[in-house]
Swiss-Prot record:
It holds the Pfam family ACR_tran. Keywords: Cell inner membrane, Cell membrane, Membrane, Transmembrane, Transmembrane helix, Transport. This is Multidrug resistance protein MdtC. The keyword Transmembrane helix applies.
């Protein structure tokens, strides 16, 4: 009593306290970062190593395996995957959430150093690492185009000047430059000319290496001067290499230009990048795992004018893709939804109280509670994101509940003739415990979420804490500011109603009278209500088992990613043509704004595309509908497949795949894996629950298998080392020398001129110089025949692995797909030597599925414990919790009605309903207990009177929560796919709960009382008119 009086009789102090809360909130709001979702990125580090010309199997055994054995010893590694392709190995390390990325990077570098002695000596450079997840979509893509500069020159500008500067920007984790390679001097050899001159490829390599050296020459000194010695020991351009003497034949000099075409070109000619049908260099920028995407993008944009000045005017630098506009638009939509929710909630209060003066009170208390929450969010290190803003939107209905309960009870005393200050004190005292019970039991719902681990726990923690803080501030405001304003603003007389509102008042009275009559009937037919209650419990179980489930709603971020997978024997020239064809099909779609893509590198038969869609208000279709439309057009392109998926804000794992979900096959027996993977993939491709089924196992690449006759080689004076060196020199784009320039280092690349390697007859033109100096054709000691070979070798841990990726067809959920895959694996009878498991997002979904029911039970148990402590009773909490089954049925039926799967967002809605719907029962039980203790009423009369007296605040709080959530259901635009499941769940649960709990709660209350009476042998009582 004294606590409430302290604030009611000291209005200045109470107002200043509220102003202080508001000012802190405004300050926190201005400093809060902006993000699409809470920070849930796993720390990921990518290790890269190269050995030009080495086969995928060689890279896997000699490079990947030694590195994996060393890296696998690092503490906190939750997953390690690797992929080895032609001349390249990439190892992805995913760490536990709590692992510091910088500390992990130091451990990775130490592990690389430890494995260095086990790696091949011919590697051109040491393995390197990057603190970025290569499977994440870039946060920004920049393109360089020019009508004047070559692709190699553009790549040089990008990698030498732009990429290092961008990499230094806070938040940037990796800048991947694609579309070409660094400039190089390329030496294209003529095999016939070499044979005629008696010059071997090793002779050419040695001559070039010896002619281009950079060594210290020292200095000369006399008594007074010192001269630095400088020589022309370096060759820098193709024109300087052309006249180089590489051999003497019959006394005549054989120059490099006599046996080769020397050009200024690029290191790897098998790379291509494009933007909107124009050749381009791409800078794909990814953020650090812990970085804020909006801040990082803003920092990059601020740096762009400076970057533009560092490159020639003839080079056009453009932003091809930027993730931030969609994120900003989504947050603006949520902010608008929040404002609408506040307005609707205040409208509900006005309609029920029919007093402008009384409506001002919640109109002040609600913003104070919400704005004050921003200060706590800032102190907790949170961000303004879709989930935290949705928490505030939902909190609108919660925070007004406390004010409504206090305000309505004070208004009732005023209408009875009590003086304002006395009514404020008495009314607050009567409902203070009720408000405290509602708030604490609501916060208790979120305690299991705060203790939940893994990605779901990290994702939901910010939502739970934000909502809990808002409820806590609301509790403080409703017991301080609200009664003070009631005492000083409201009048003792009954407020005058506007004529247009009298009809609503009469309707409310009629509704209350009708409820009273129906309640009397129900209380005399309790068995029927008991059956209904038991039926809702059973229906909950059935609906939860049968409803489709998924991990997270499929987002429309306005960005699509496409992975191209062509025939495994396709040439680079044909693959570049496929890229152009696919880009044209997509570019012609009316919903597409921009298309960029690239192909080449170590995987000639694959490519990537990044598609920016037009803003949401400029297109009528969702991203998934656009994918469905494009899938039909793309299927007509022969010889290649393009798999499209919408970029998501949440992506788990480091695997680069062509679809959103993955199923990984592991085996210690590589032969068994290669036997069963095609069978499993073909089976999964027939399932209607899956779409775009593809695999990263590519073991049907074309290979030319050479078999050496070692006896003949020994007789001819040729060793295997010389033969292998010949092949590497001829076909491996061998980097044989380095050109040092002030800004970068460039390579001299040697191979047989592509004009002489158009078919397998090129092998017949190759020869080796034996130990007697004679030219021995390759065909003398080797035979060759076509064969199949893997284009990539993949590992997970240290086991051979193959990952099957898939998307979901329209109308199918992840639970449908998971169940179908499990059935297919059982039907196929896959041996125990091949193990299958879901990976990435699908794996997290499986883990979340196993914990959802436990989480809901834990929330209910926590609420029961809190209520039991507050009421000092084992029974009354059960009465209050009896409201939950009807809310669950309503939520699940609403999801089914709107064809929305049960996701993590819907789970949040269920948890919220546990907190919301019990408020009705708390208000009933509190007043019934009070009436029994002080009014000398029977339990039946007490609960009946409590239901009637609390009917208006129950209707007000329920409608306030309903109208607070309704904008989430009705909102459109960016990010609406996240808001809809939450709104649908809450609205459906509230509607069903309101219809049933007004009757089931008093029946359950009397049921437990009759149990008490039966044990104490008291006579049964009935309700009288």
């Amino acid at each position: 009593m004294k606590f409430f009086a302290l604030f009611i009789y000291r209005p200045v102090a109470t107002i200043l306290l509220s102003v202080a809360i508001t000012l802190c909130g405004i300050l926190g709001f201005r400093m809060l970062p902006v993000a699409p979702l809470p920070q849930v990125d796993f720390p990921v580090i990518m290790v890269s190593a190269s050995l030009p010309g080495a086969s995928p199997e060689t890279m896997a055994s000699s490079v990947a395996t030694p590195l994996e054995r060393s890296l696998g010893r690092i503490a906190g590694v939750s997953e390690m995957t690797s992929s080895s392709s032609l001349g390249s190995t990439r190892i992805i390390l995913q760490f536990d959430f709590d692992r510091d990325i910088n500390g992990a990077a130091r451990d990775v570098q130490a592990a690389i150093n430890a494995a260095q002695s086990l790696l091949p000596s011919g590697m051109p450079s040491r393995p390197t690492y990057r603190k970025a997840n290569p499977s994440d979509a870039p946060i920004m893509i920049l393109t360089l185009t020019s009508d004047t500069y070559s692709q190699g020159e553009l790549y040089d500008f990008a990698s030498t000047q732009l990429a290092p500067t961008i990499s230094q920007i806070d938040g940037v984790g990796d800048v991947d430059v694609g579309g070409s390679s660094l400039p190089a001097v390329r030496v294209g050899l003529n095999p016939q000319a070499l044979f005629n001159q008696g010059v071997s490829l090793d002779d050419v390599r040695t001559a070039i290496s010896n002619a281009n050296v950079r060594k210290p020459q020292g200095a000369l000194e006399d008594g007074t001067h010192r001269w630095q010695i400088q020589t022309n020991d370096e060759l820098k351009t193709a024109a300087e290499y052309q006249p180089l003497i590489i051999h003497y034949n019959n006394g005549g000099a054989v120059r490099l230009g006599d046996v080769a075409t020397v050009t200024d070109s690029v290191q790897d000619v098998r790379n291509a990048g494009m933007t909107n049908a124009k050749p381009a260099i791409l800078l794909m920028i990814r953020k650090l795992p812990e970085a804020n995407i909006i801040q990082t993008v803003d920092s990059i944009r601020a740096k762009l004018p400076e970057l533009q000045e560092t490159i020639p005017a003839a080079i056009d630098l453009q932003i091809a893709q930027d993730r931030s506009p969609t994120i900003r638009a989504s947050l603006e939509e949520v902010e608008q939804t929040l404002i609408i929710s506040v307005a609707l909630v205040i409208l509900v209060v006005f309609l029920f109280l029919r007093s402008g003066r009384a409506t001002i009170i919640p109109a002040v208390s609600v913003p104070v509670s919400l704005i004050g929450t921003f200060a706590a969010m800032y102190l907790c290190g949170f961000s303004l994101n879709n989930l935290s803003l949705m928490a505030l939107t939902i909190a609108t209905g919660f925070v007004v509940d406390d004010a409504i309960v206090v305000l309505e009870n004070i208004a009732r005393h005023l209408e009875a003739g009590m003086k304002p200050l006395q009514a404020a004190l008495q009314g607050t005292r009567e409902v203070g415990f009720t408000v405290l019970s509602m708030s604490l039991s609501l916060v208790a719902v979120f305690l299991p979420l705060l203790l939940m681990g893994g990605l779901p726990g990290r994702l939901l923690r910010e939502f739970a804490v934000t909502l809990s803080v808002a409820i806590g501030i609301s509790l403080l405001v409703s017991l301080t500011l609200t009664p003070m304003m009631c005492g000083w603003m409201l009048k003792a007389s009954k407020p005058r109603e506007q004529k247009r509102l009298r009809g609503f008042g009469r309707m409310l009275v009629a509704l209350q009278q009708g409820y009273g009559k129906s309640l009397k009937w129900v209380l005399n037919h309790t068995r029927l209500v008991g059956v209904v209650l038991l039926g809702t419990i059973a229906l909950n179980i059935w609906l939860y088992i049968s409803i489709p489930k998924t991990f997270f709603p499929e987002q429309d971020t306005g960005v699509l990613m496409g992975g191209i997978q062509a025939d495994q024997s396709i040439s680079f020239q044909a693959m570049r043509g496929k890229l152009q064809d696919f880009m044209k099909i997509i570019r012609d779609d009316p919903a597409v704004d921009n298309v960029t893509g690239f192909t080449g590198g170590s995987r000639v038969n694959s490519g990537m595309m990044f598609i920016t869609l037009k803003p949401r208000d400029e297109r009528s279709e969702t991203a998934q509908q656009i994918i469905d439309r494009l899938r039909v057009k793309l299927a007509k392109e022969p010889g290649a497949n393009l798999f499209l998926m919408a970029v998501q804000d949440i992506r788990v794992g480091g695997r680069q795949s062509n679809a959103s979900y993955q199923y990984t096959l592991l085996s210690d027996d590589l032969a068994a894996l290669r036997e069963w993977e095609p069978k499993i993939r073909k089976k999964l491709a027939t399932l209607p629950e899956l779409a775009d089924v593809n695999s990263d196992q590519q073991d049907n690449g074309a290979e030319m298998n050479l078999v050496y006759d070692r006896d003949t080689m020994a007789r001819l004076g040729i060793d295997v080392q010389a033969a292998n060196s010949l092949l590497n020199n001829a076909f491996g784009q061998r980097q044989i020398s380095t050109i040092y320039q002030p800004m970068n280092q460039y390579k001299v690349v040697m191979e047989v001129d592509p004009r002489y390697t158009q078919d397998i007859s090129a092998l017949e033109k190759m020869f080796v110089i034996n130990n007697e100096g004679k030219a021995i054709p390759l065909s003398y000691f080797a035979k060759w025949q076509p064969a199949n070979a893997p284009l990539s070798v993949n590992h997970q841990g240290l086991s051979a692995a193959s990952t099957i990726s898939f998307n979901l067809p329209t109308g199918k959920s992840l639970s449908d797909a998971s169940a179908a895959i499990d059935r297919a694996m059982t039907q196929l009878g896959v041996p125990s030597t091949v193990r299958g498991s879901f990976a990435g997002t699908a794996q997290v979904f499986q883990e979340t599925m196993n914990s959802q029911v436990i989480l809901i039970i834990a929330a209910i148990a926590t609420v029961y414990i809190v209520l039991g402590i507050l009421y000092e009773s084992y029974v009354h909490p059960l009465t209050i919790l009896s409201t939950l089954p009807s809310a669950g049925v309503g939520a699940l039926l609403a999801l089914e009605l709107f064809n929305a799967p049960f996701s993590l967002i819907a789970l949040i809605g269920i948890m919220l309903l546990i907190g919301i719907v019990k408020k009705n029962a708390i208000m009933m039980v509190d007043f019934a207990l009070e009436a029994q203790r002080h009014g000398n009423l029977t339990p039946q009369e007490a609960i009946f009177q409590a239901c009637l007296l609390r009917f208006r605040p129950i209707m007000m709080t329920t409608l306030a929560a309903l109208f607070g959530a309704l904008p989430l259901v009705l909102s459109g635009g960016d990010g609406s796919e996240l808001r809809h499941p939450l709104g649908i769940t809450i609205v459906g649960g509230l509607v069903m709960s309101q219809l049933l709990t007004l009757y089931t709660t008093p029946v359950v209350y009397l049921f437990f009382d009759r149990l008490r009476l039966r044990f104490s042998r008291k006579p049964k009582q009935t309700v009288t008119e």
